[in-house]
A protein has these predicted regions:
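Short, small/polar-rich loop/turn modules that mediate ligand/substrate recognition or access, typified
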Residues: 204, 209, 265-267
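Residue(s) in the substrate-gating loop at a strand-loop-helix junction
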Residues: 172
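Active-site helix of classical SDR
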Residues: 154, 188, 196
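A conserved structural motif in NAD(P)-dependent oxidoreductases
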Residues: 239-250
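The beta1-alpha1 cofactor-binding region of Rossmann-like NAD(H)/NADP(H)-dependent oxidoreductases
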Residues: 71, 92-105, 136, 248-249
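Short C-terminal tail/terminal secondary-structure segment
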Residues: 17, 22-26, 128, 177, ...
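Substrate-binding pocket helix/loop in short-chain dehydrogenase/reductase
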Residues: 129-131, 135-140, 235
């Protein structure tokens, strides 16, 4: 099972992908697990972020959707949240900017009433065959977007989070099985898993749980926007299940970690990889 070869400009637009990723728009059914909660999701416009936003809304949460510049994708996701009967706020901007991270949290507090769930999901990657191809600016952008942003978001959010709140970092199978072509990205994803494990210990006394999710190859706009077309065509074929995952297949894990169903789950890294081991 594969996708046609295709290429987009960074950051990628979901509506222009073939096939369009399945984020659970027509399939996810909630059962009230997050009623009364406020969630902040970075990279919430498309892919995994959209699937999580839809699932959270159908479980009863209001959602702030942070995104870089993909206005049409973000508005589509907002529409799905609002059709679930929940409030939604869009925040356009770059999480590589520490002040923007602080503004995201303050906006959630001001417009939605607080922060109960923080999902640090926005990510940047590029594929290279040699270290010499990676510019200093690209290295810095990857670090700032993927791991520094999580630090700034958490630092701003924690004072507003009550006992029972949840922080979730989107790590990757690359945290354990790093792709040599994605060296900067893989390093940041390992850092996210490690940072979440540290935070779980720091915040346990406050009753705040912290976990990370390690997706395998998931069909999102990041793929055609950052990989050469020939790699896109065969993306996901090397998993034991023989295919890339769909964003909707991640959403139930985020719901578990955000809800009382996961009330004793903290410090974990949950692998959703199609069979590729994360030990």
């Amino acid at each position: 099972m594969s996708q046609p070869a295709q290429q987009q400009e960074v950051p990628g637009v979901q509506s222009e992908m073939t096939p369009v990723p399945d984020c659970g728009e027509e399939s996810y059914e909630g059962s009230g697990k997050l009623v009364g909660k406020v969630a902040v999701i970075t990279g919430g416009d498309s892919g995994i972020g959209r699937a999580v936003a839809i699932a959270f809304a159908r479980e009863g949460a209001d959602v702030l959707i942070s995104y870089l510049s993909e206005d049409s994708d973000a508005k589509d996701t907002q529409g799905w949240v609002e059709r679930a009967g929940r409030r939604s706020v869009l925040m356009r901007g770059d999480v590589a900017d520490p002040q923007h991270c602080r503004d995201i949290i303050q906006t959630a507090v001001d417009e939605l009433g607080g922060v109960d769930i923080l999902v640090s999901n926005a990510a940047f990657q590029m594929s290279h065959d040699s270290l010499e191809e990676i510019s200093d600016d690209e290295w810095d952008r990857t670090i700032h977007t993927n791991i520094s942003a999580m630090f700034h978001l958490c630092k701003a959010a924690i004072p507003h989070m009550k006992a029972g709140s949840s922080i979730i970092g989107s790590s990757s199978v690359n945290s354990d099985m790093p792709s040599p072509q994605l060296a900067p990205y893989a390093a940041t994803k390992a850092a996210i898993a490690n940072f979440c494990a540290s935070l779980a210990q720091l915040l346990g006394e406050k009753g705040i749980r912290v976990n990370s999710v390690a997706p395998g190859p998931i069909w999102t706009p990041l793929i055609p926007a950052t990989m050469p077309p020939e790699k896109v065509q065969h993306f996901g074929e090397n998993t034991p299940l023989g295919r890339a995952g769909q964003p909707k297949e991640l959403a139930p894990v985020y719901v578990l970690l955000a809800s009382d169903d996961g009330s004793f789950v903290s410090g974990a890294r949950v692998a959703v990889t199609g069979g590729r081991p994360v030990l």
